[in-house]
């Protein structure tokens, strides 16, 4: 959109009408499949420990809390939705605001709309198929292709990400003229992410959506480790036309293992000079009480709408981006 007074919306009114139609289409998709729409809090007393996520923090002062308590805007509704699953709600979805205190640009806004849903008794592959169904319906695109993380690296970088050591990863980075970053990086997963971002992403999802699945176990986050290959996690991401659209897991249900991962994240944070984050005990208690075997996925709605409309930037499909908020 051309430069206008900042009181005006960044997106055109016709685009906002099309966005509303897509939101309605998403709701029909899940209603037709018997998936319950839910609403969960935008704030929590705990937050994510992932070293790559940066939440907004605020402080509540009120009756019973005269000294104030810290609250965090949710980076995704995942933890609350899993508590609903543990309480027996069955399959659920949510369209909600999420917040990340990170970059802004063509594909990023600190406040954004997330579509997240969970399917009890679905494995990773069955959920991938459902994501594919939704993308075909909203984007009118071809059926997606799928590549394992290992296959993607071998095809585009000629290196095995599951066995390569840091020296080999740095050599691969040098071929991409990334030595200035890679040579001083000691974290193997950061090196892998650098190679994936610069050496794999530009080549996938050009003509049709591409699922990348079986990420390294060290990048499992809240996903289960594969029982068939302990080197990989039951995790997938979806890419289309240069954009990461979604991130999904066959969800970890073991409370003790999840706590260990949170604690490991905080140790990594401390080593990098980042603040350690409060662990969500309510989530751990829900896992201990019994999270059903399930798979879940988070999808960026603003990016989906941008692709559906052939727009150049999130600003073309969001009423007011942060610089106009």
Curated annotation (Swiss-Prot):
GO biological process, one term: lysyl-tRNA aminoacylation
This protein's record includes keyword ATP-binding: yes
Catalytic activity: D-beta-lysine + L-lysyl-[protein] + ATP = N(6)-((3R)-3,6-diaminohexanoyl)-L-lysyl-[protein] + AMP + diphosphate + H(+)
EC number(s) given by UniProt: 6.3.2.-
Function: With EpmB is involved in the beta-lysylation step of the post-translational modification of translation elongation factor P (EF-P) on 'Lys-34'. Catalyzes the ATP-dependent activation of (R)-beta-lysine produced by EpmB, forming a lysyl-adenylate, from which the beta-lysyl moiety is then transferred to the epsilon-amino group of EF-P 'Lys-34'.
NCBIfam families reported for this sequence: genX, PRK09350.1
Name of this protein: Elongation factor P--(R)-beta-lysine ligase
Taxonomic classification: Bacteria, Pseudomonadati, Pseudomonadota, Gammaproteobacteria, Enterobacterales
